[in-house]
Amino acid sequence: KILIDCGSGVTQRLNQSKNSSADIDALLLTHLHTDHVIDLYQLIISSWHSDRDSIWKIYGPKGTKKFVDKIFSAWKIERELRISYEKRKSTNALKYKVYELKKNGSIKINDIKIKYFEVDHKPVPYAYGFSFYNNNKKLTISGDTRPCESLMQNALNSDVLLHEVFIEYEMNKTSKLRTKKTLHNVKEY
């Protein structure tokens, strides 16, 4: 199982869908915005509580190793207390290996070939989309992006395209107007 990003509530969503963080083979991060990584540490702790016995494989943009190291540093005392108090059979779930993605490339996780490619999520310097290949099927995930050539090229011939929506800052002005009008219309209905 592969998890893409770990935003707020990811552990709860996994549990609700009858999945366990202990069963995740790899974590792919599209970019390092909080809405995509805020629950990383909770995900890892939850996997340990679910008796995960393998080291985390985390793939992400440049800066991911430093980011994960800092999170683990911030929670070091709390983690050491848990380890000494809870006495679980393994601490492998609390270990990780980070693979920082280059500009464009591919990796293989189990039987799935994954092609990663840069997308345009300015001002973020490193943001990625992913195409997954398995059993002659192709799934492409855009990550946060504006329209860009790399996504259009990599999404070609996909069986499924999962595309995130990025709202331009300027759109907030019109969305507030539409929201106000919509709320007014709902009251009248």
Task: Walk through the language-model features, giving the residues of each.
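Cap/insert and terminal regions of metallo-dependent hydrolase folds
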Residues: G129, N136-K138, R146-Y189
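Binuclear metal-dependent hydrolase catalytic cores
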Residues: K1-T140
